[in-house]
Structure formats: structure tokens, C-alpha cells
């Protein structure tokens, strides 16, 4: 290769690298800020490595119902909710695989309402787009995304190129402002109170797509195998909810899941309001989810339940322990002030 050809190749490579960097920067700017309602990967990756005791997975039933800071206040156990809106088990598997690159929890707690979802739900784009870039994200797109969304997920300017009129200083600042851990730990605060006066829990119909259910079970098998390989315990819950499936459907789900992973602990809590101490006239956000007050009670109950099962808090650095104490106090103050205002 003569000097001219070599120079041309070097210029071409430099151009490609520069173009890739510019496209990456543009993608960061154009992609909307996302720090609630699941898929909070930036904050998760800022947690100190191997500092999380409990990893919560699932859909909005997970990130609305569990507040890890409140659980910490009640039990000393640290946790994070790495969930996503209407997240299917196939995506949950890839979330778990990615999450375990920086954390080694004692137990994974998966909220299992997603086993009743369709093959694809409404928030695939958000669930996958905010995953860290890498081979697992690419494999997740091919495995769990609708075919017509894959192009935009691989090249997200396809989705967001027309956002330039909506850009804010916060969008631009993402390029130079590093992400940080926060007090939410994947939890999303919702405070609406669902009116249940004179009513009782109503029936929820799961998807009738048997192919979707089989795919969800295949994903669960991979989740269970990954937990087994890593020496992590696995609990599947159906969280307290006013929209409940029939006992027969829950029985079938338990049989199917424990048939795949006999070591997994299945906890049907859909109608366990009294056991947990929930007030259905105050603690529900809507027909499906708990509100902030309900999440506080359920998170305290979850922490104590996990202690009873033999899990114990791991040792934390002085700095991280102080951060958890401060975060817990923030949420406890918010709860206490809200209760005082309501009384």
C-alpha cells in the first residue's frame, strides 16, 4: 500500500469514527430523560458494585409496589427495582442478565403478573432502548422486540430525530453531566387513591395467546437457570392487587413455574391485604397497583418477610450505608408528613 492509499484509508477510518461519535452524542441528546416508571439503568449502574441484597424484577407491579428504601428502613436489606412498564418475561431475562454484571444479590424477587401478558406489550421501546449498549441489548432486541421496532432500537435516532424542537437544557446536559445513584432505587412514586367504596376485587382475564404464555415460560426457565448458576435464590410473587385472576389460573401458574424451577418460591399475595396490613380504601393507586402509602406498608412487610426467610443485610461501606440511611429518612419523612396532612 503506497503512502497516498494509506492516508486515504486513515482519513476514511477517522471519518467513520467521528461520524459514529457524533451519532452517539446525538442519540444521547435526543433520547428523552428517563428516571422513573422503570428502565432506570443510568441510576442502577451508579450503585456501588455488589451492594444490593435484593433485586426486584417485573413490570409496573414491581416499580409501583416496592420502595427499596422503605424496605431498608424496616430490615436493613438493600434493594433495587430493575423493572419496566408492561415488561414481558423475555425482556426481564435480559434485564437480569445485564443487572448481574454489577450486582450479586442474595435473592431475586420477580413479580409474576407479566406471565399473563401478550407476546408484546405497549412499552417494548422504552424497556429496551434504555438498556446499556452492548451485545446483551442487541440480543434482547432480536429476542423480545416486535420486528417493526427493531430498526429504531438499533438506531434510536430513527425514533427521536424529530425531538429537536422539544430539547431542553437537561437534554443537552446529559452529554457532560454524569449519572448518579438516587433515592428511588427504581421505585416510582404514585399517590392517587383508588375509590374501592362498596366494591370488591374484580376478575382480570389473562392473555389467551398460548404461544405467548409458552414463550413467557421459556423466559422464566432461563431466569431460573441464571439464578441457579449464580447461586441466587428466586422468589416469584403475585403482588396485592384489586384486579385478580381466578384461583384456577393462579394454581396453574404456580404448577407451571415450580415444575420448571422446583427451588423457586411462589408467593400468591393478590388478595393478602389483611395479612400485609393494607387498607383497600386508601392504599391502592388504581385497580392494579399500590400507591405510595400501600407501597410503604408492602415494602416494610417484604423486608421483614425476607428476614424471616433467613436473608441478612450485607456489610456496606460507611459512605453507602450513610446514603441508604439518608434515602430511607427522605421517604419516611415524606410518608409521615403525608399522613399528618391527611389526618
Sequence positions of predicted segments:
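Alpha-helical transmembrane signal-anchor/signal-peptide segments
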Residues: 29-50
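C-terminal regions of proteins
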Residues: 251, 255-326, 330-342
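Hydrophobic membrane-insertion alpha-helices, especially the h-region
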Residues: 10-28
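Flexible, glycine-rich surface segments
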Residues: 194-280
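Secreted/periplasmic serine-hydrolase-like ester/acetyl group-modifying domain
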Residues: 125-232, 314-343
Amino acid at each position: 500500500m503506497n503512502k497516498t492509499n494509506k492516508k486515504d484509508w486513515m482519513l476514511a477510518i477517522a471519518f467513520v469514527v467521528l461520524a459514529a461519535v457524533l451519532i452517539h452524542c446525538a442519540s444521547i441528546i435526543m433520547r428523552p430523560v428517563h428516571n422513573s416508571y422503570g428502565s432506570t439503568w443510568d441510576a442502577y449502574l451508579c450503585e456501588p458494585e455488589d451492594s444490593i441484597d435484593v433485586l426486584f424484577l417485573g413490570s409496573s407491579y414491581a416499580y409501583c409496589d416496592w420502595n427499596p428504601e422503605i424496605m431498608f428502613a424496616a430490615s436493613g436489606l438493600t434493594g433495587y427495582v430493575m423493572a419496566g412498564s408492561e415488561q414481558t418475561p423475555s425482556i426481564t431475562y435480559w434485564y437480569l442478565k445485564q443487572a448481574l454484571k454489577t450486582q450479586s444479590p442474595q435473592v431475586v424477587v420477580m413479580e409474576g403478573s407479566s406471565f399473563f401478558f401478550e407476546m408484546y406489550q405497549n412499552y417494548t421501546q422504552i424497556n429496551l432502548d434504555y438498556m446499556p449498549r452492548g451485545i446483551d441489548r442487541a440480543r434482547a432486541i432480536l429476542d423480545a422486540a416486535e420486528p417493526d421496532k427493531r430498526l429504531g432500537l438499533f438506531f434510536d435516532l430513527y425514533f427521536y430525530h424529530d425531538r429537536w424542537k422539544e430539547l431542553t437544557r437537561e437534554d443537552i446536559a446529559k452529554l457532560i453531566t454524569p449519572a448518579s445513584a438516587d433515592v428511588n432505587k427504581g421505585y416510582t412514586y404514585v399517590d392517587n387513591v383508588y375509590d374501592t367504596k362498596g366494591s370488591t376485587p374484580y376478575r382480570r382475564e389473562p392473555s389467551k395467546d398460548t404461544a405467548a404464555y409458552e414463550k413467557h415460560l421459556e423466559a422464566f426457565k432461563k431466569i431460573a437457570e441464571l439464578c441457579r448458576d449464580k447461586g441466587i435464590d428466586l422468589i416469584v410473587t403475585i403482588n396485592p392487587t384489586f384486579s385478580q385472576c381466578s384461583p384456577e389460573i393462579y394454581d396453574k401458574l404456580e404448577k407451571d413455574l415450580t415444575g420448571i424451577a422446583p427451588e423457586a418460591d411462589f408467593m400468591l399475595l393478590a388478595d393478602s391485604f389483611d395479612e400485609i396490613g393494607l387498607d383497600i380504601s386508601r392504599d391502592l393507586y388504581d385497580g392494579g397497583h399500590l400507591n405510595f402509602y400501600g407501597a410503604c406498608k408492602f415494602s416494610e412487610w417484604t423486608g421483614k418477610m425476607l428476614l424471616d426467610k433467613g436473608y441478612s443485610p450485607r456489610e456496606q461501606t460507611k459512605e453507602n450505608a450513610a446514603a441508604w440511611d439518608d434515602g430511607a429518612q427522605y421517604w419516611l419523612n415524606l410518608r409521615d408528613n403525608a399522613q399528618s396532612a391527611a389526618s
